[in-house]
Amino acid sequence: MSKLKVCLRHISEVFLYEYYCLGDDEYEISDEDTLTPHKEKAKEQLLAGNYSGAQQEWLSAHLENPVDMETILGIILCCKQLGDADGEYSYSTESYNYCCTRAELAAYYRNLGWYYLEKYKPEVSAACYLYSKYFGESQQADAELEFLEKAVGKKVAKKDLPQIQKILKDNQIPTEANPVTLALLYKAAEEAAEGRDKDQALDCYRMVYDLTADKEIGKRIESLESR
């Protein structure tokens, strides 16, 4: 049986791919960069306003690297522009496993906010947008909240963090980074450090620290940086 060929360029991608995507298949990493050309074409199509064409290129990129967040976010953007709410939700929920920074988690909650507004669930939508702001202030989230208020004809009620988290949990929406993903990033960091790949080890530790602010991880980063 032929091996799958994928374009993975970072140890974090290898760990995420092997855990979330590989299954029982075998794979090999392509020698050439088969991902970037599709991403560049997708961006060209976006600039031309061809969302269907852009989506096809993003989907081709997704086949080359299923864990690349820029690609998944590109697909989600096209789903929104093409009015495909169910597709947007499917890729948004998939993206949760690959959120490695606070900015990516913020995007995850904003994308869920869009979906729940499309499905006429304004309270859940508002909770998602409000929660996204805890991971990073965003003009986009503010604009979407303004749009939501106009759509329902009233102001979004102020809620504290526990109230927002309760709404999310009641709708089976996670309220923190995926602990499995954090563990995978930590393992990737350790393996990179053992292999004397300081830069990739630092990348992985910094992603974990960004999501957790764990003091022990902070010390490891300082130790590596001083070498």
What are these regions (language model features)?
Residues 47-48, 81, 118-119, 150-151, ...:
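Register position in tetratricopeptide repeats
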Residues 30-64, 184-195, 200:
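Alpha-helical segment of the N-proximal tetratricopeptide repeat
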Residues 36, 70, 104-107, 140, ...:
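Start-of-helix register in tetratricopeptide repeats
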Residues 66, 100-103, 136-137, 179, ...:
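Short coil turns that delineate tetratricopeptide repeat
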